[in-house]
Amino acid sequence: LYGLSGAVVGAVDLVRGIGRLAGLDVIDVPGATGDLDTDYGAKARAAVAALDDHDLVWVHVEAPDEAAHMGDLRAKVRAIERVDAEVLAPILSAPQRPAAMVLPDHHTPLSTRTHADPPVPFVISEPLPGSGGGGAMTFGEADAAATGLLVASGAELMRLFLEATG
């Protein structure tokens, strides 16, 4: 995949299958459930360990999506907070000093409790080339839309990520 060795950490069969088809190693993580009760820390530890022998690790956490399907705002906020504190923070502070890109795989508005197709916000831990680092200061749909940056495809997003992170 893009000339990189990669792995996927996640419990959802669809995600694991996509990873396998993309040539990624699928990492089994005890306690990873694909639901609100997933072991966030175990996913982070597995990702950090995988960085020792992979260039790229895709970590998928289903909990915010599941909370949205339930229409539970508090659970969705809590799941996002846990991703930030228990998954992203440990990965970014790992000895390998990895770059990161964070994004949802799709919208799931609480109001409809179902998937929607607007563009999703994303954040990359390094500034995009030529951007001057002038992206959104917070992470959300409205802030992302205000930047005027619209990425047409996953391949284009990956190209931007690889350019930004060297």
Give the role of each language-model region.
Residues L1-G166:
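Feature captures the catalytic ectodomains and active-site-proximal regions of enzymes
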